[in-house]
Amino acid sequence: MRVFLDTNVIVYAHDRAEIKRHPAAVRVIDALLTESDEVVISPQVAGEFVNTMKRKGTPPATLALQIRGLSVFELSSPTLSTISAAWALCTAHSIAWYDAILVQTAIDARCDKLYSEDMQHGRKFGGLEVVNPFVQR
């Protein structure tokens, strides 16, 4: 199984101040890295992670280590075809533009699941299912 991570899951895994979500995010990422064939992020996710952690006041040396830590994930970059298909998703499914880019990048990377709290848990886009790891099951 191939999975795609949205920024919020990675941020919560690094931000101990997120008392409710931090432990869950760490457990989810650890499990995915152990059990999945590949855990994928995009440059958009990496950039949003850096921006968010910088805004939260993470010291530069710590952030540099966190950035290097992202190398455990496969990086999948969107193409112009991805952007075109994302626009079609955005208009057909009424989802936010940047969410559509993430969804299409995950689809292009042949992922089965997209872990995010920003979209409806269980929603499907073709063979890709959105999983909110913070939903009580």
Please provide the spans of the model-predicted regions.
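Acidic, PIN/NYN-like endoribonuclease modules and their adjacent C-terminal/linker elements
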Residues: I107-R137
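Histidine- and aromatic-rich ligand-binding microenvironments
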Residues: D6, I41-S42, I95-A96, D118, ...
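Short, well-structured N-terminal submotif of metal-dependent ribonuclease cores
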Residues: M1-I41, R55-T62, R137
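Glycine/small-residue-rich phosphate/adenosyl-binding loop
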Residues: P43-F73
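Structured helix-beta-strand junction loops
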Residues: E35-S36, V72-F73, H93
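Hydrophobic helix-cap positions at the C-terminus of alpha-helices
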Residues: A31-L32, L70, L89
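Active-site neighborhoods of divalent-metal-dependent phosphate/nucleic-acid chemistry enzymes
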Residues: L75-E117
